[in-house]
Amino acid sequence: MGNSYGFIEIPGVVAAMDALDIMCKTANVTLSTWERKLGGRLVTLVVEGDVSAVTQAVEAACAHALKKPAASGVLASPHAEIVRLVEKSASRFKEKGAEA
């Protein structure tokens, strides 16, 4: 889709789903993966798209999500190691979905 990643780390699964909805409705981005930590009390969303869409999506989620993100960022043209890390997380995410 694109060659940039946007990251949002936000407290709670419900707030994360709200942030993802905002990001996907705001710009042409897709969910690459997500990670739940601390029993779901902290959720990291990773979206993918071109740099302008990812930036717009992350900014919109930070401004309008149910809860304030703990952290956020955009990586334009991420290093190959970052891509590998996101792809590894995405493969675990897809495997869990296939088991359900």
Language model feature labels by segment:
Residues 36-39:
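A short beta-turn/loop motif at secondary-structure boundaries
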